[in-house]
Design a protein with these regions (language model features):
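Loop/turn elements at helix/coil->beta-strand transitions in domains of secreted/extracellular proteins
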Residues: 41, 195-196
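Aromatic-residue-lined binding/catalytic grooves and analogous aromatic/hydrophobic interfacial grooves
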Residues: 65-167, 173-179, 191-194
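N-terminal targeting/trafficking signals and adjacent low-complexity tails
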Residues: 18-22
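Stable alpha-helical elements in mature extracytoplasmic
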Residues: 25-34, 91, 95, 184
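Surface-exposed loop and adjacent secondary-structure segments within mature catalytic domains
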Residues: 13, 34-68
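Non-catalytic membrane-recruitment/adaptor modules and adjacent regulatory linkers
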Residues: 27, 35-36, 175-179
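Flexible glycine/proline-enriched surface loops and loop-helix/loop-strand junctions
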Residues: 11-17
Length: 197
């Protein structure tokens, strides 16, 4: 909880400067896939905002900052935990509305027709995003892979975890093993050669 810290605390400043990131770390993707599932592009196609997220990211960041300031001010005025939770939920409703308007509302269930390479129908079934993930991915990707990174500002051959860098509240922080670039390069080449990537 950062509301007990002064507004000029380094952690608070970082949270307000970076209320949302562009994503892309494997741990965040695997957390979200496991939690929410997936849908085929035919069911939920790209939108202008999903293929170019810069403006949406700015709108989300502004909404999150406004909500954060409102929560801090309300906390300083002594509002109850129930009142603060209500304010937080109101802020999250604004976030959901922005996402829904820009990306669409994900389906809770959908029918999908599986076809072979020649276009012949194999089956048509009803799925939820989670059941589609289970059927076509079938593996819980969380904890199955290790991220390798080159960060020369930190000692090599150690595991690092970046606090507050996750895609879901209950997800895992971005964690990586810090290695010299030459070793990462050798591992990438070996992985490509033996098809384990």
């Amino acid at each position: 909880r950062s509301s007990d810290l002064p507004i000029n605390d380094a952690k608070v400043e970082w949270l307000f400067k970076n209320p949302i990131n562009d994503g892309g770390q494997f741990t965040g993707i695997s957390d979200n896939l496991y939690k929410y599932g997936v849908v085929p592009a035919e069911i939920m196609p790209e939108t202008a905002s999903s293929s170019n997220t810069k403006l949406l990211g700015k709108m989300l960041a502004r909404t999150l900052r406004q909500t954060g300031i409102q929560l801090r001010n309300a906390s300083e005025k002594g509002e109850s935990l129930a009142q603060l939770r209500k304010r937080k939920e109101d802020g999250l409703k604004k976030v959901y509305r922005l996402l829904s308007l820009n990306l669409g509302v994900p389906p809770t269930s959908f029918s999908y027709t599986l076809k072979d390479k020649d276009g012949k129908v194999i089956s048509t079934e009803t799925y939820t995003p989670q059941s589609f993930y289970e059927r076509f991915v079938g593996t819980d990707l969380r904890g199955q892979f290790v991220m390798l990174m080159n960060d020369p500002s930190r000692p090599y051959y150690k595991v690092y975890e970046i606090e507050y860098d996750r895609h879901a509240y209950d997800g895992k922080n971005w964690t990586y093993v810090n290695l010299p670039m030459d070793e990462i390069k050798q591992m990438a080449i070996a992985s490509l050669k033996d098809n384990t990537m």
